[in-house]
Regions:
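Membrane-embedded alpha-helical bundles of multi-pass enzymes
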Residues: 1-191
Length: 191
């Protein structure tokens, strides 16, 4: 795929995630919203060099090495996706603090992209099945962290996409909103 096409896919993916959110959105879109980014990751993974030796040992250093350029591609495309997602869903923060909203957009996109790159690295080493399990683990871990630290940002937890249709998520009383995130991720991976 050409660079421009992949950039457009990443941007479309961010809009797809954003369109599934809030009052104006269509929540069922979330069940397919990660598929374009997963396909981009698969394309990059299949076309790049095998960097499986990088995960263990000195993973931090090798993440930034030239042999691991596929990680940078995954990071770049996922960052575009998640930045657009953050802007389309929490644009209203701009009215309170332009500088604060810019920081929130970028930090949230970085955290989401980091979870996605970790998934990419594990998938390269351990294969597809374990890699997709790692995606669920890293994403839920990132959301859990994001709910429990000083810079908590609960709005974009994937399970919150159903805030406008609480009738279909009554089971959240048992699993919490992270159960909804798990549901969203599993369906995106299976589809």
């Amino acid at each position: 795929l050409k660079f421009q096409i992949v950039i457009h896919i990443a941007a479309f993916n961010g809009l797809l995630l954003g369109l599934s959110w809030t009052e104006i959105g269509f929540p069922p879109l979330i069940f397919v919203a990660f598929i374009p980014l997963l396909l981009v990751e698969k394309y990059i993974s299949d076309s790049g060099p095998n960097t499986s030796w990088n995960l263990f040992g000195c993973s931090f250093l090798t993440f930034f090495s030239s042999r691991s350029y596929t990680s940078w591609k995954v990071f770049g495309y996922s960052f575009i996706t998640f930045l657009i997602f953050n802007i389309t869903t929490t644009y209203w923060v701009w009215h309170a603090s332009p500088a604060g909203s810019f920081a929130a957009f970028v930090i949230n996109a970085l955290l989401m992209s980091f979870a996605f790159v970790l998934f990419h690295k594990v998938k390269k080493v351990l294969g597809d099945k374990r890699g997709y399990f790692a995606l669920i683990f890293f994403w839920i871990s990132m959301e859990y962290l994001h709910l429990h630290w000083e810079l908590a940002w609960p709005w974009l937890t994937l399970g919150n996409v159903f805030a406008t249709v609480p009738d279909i998520v009554q089971w959240y009383e048992y699993t919490g909103v992270l159960g909804g995130s798990l549901w969203v991720l599993i369906l995106n991976i299976l589809l």
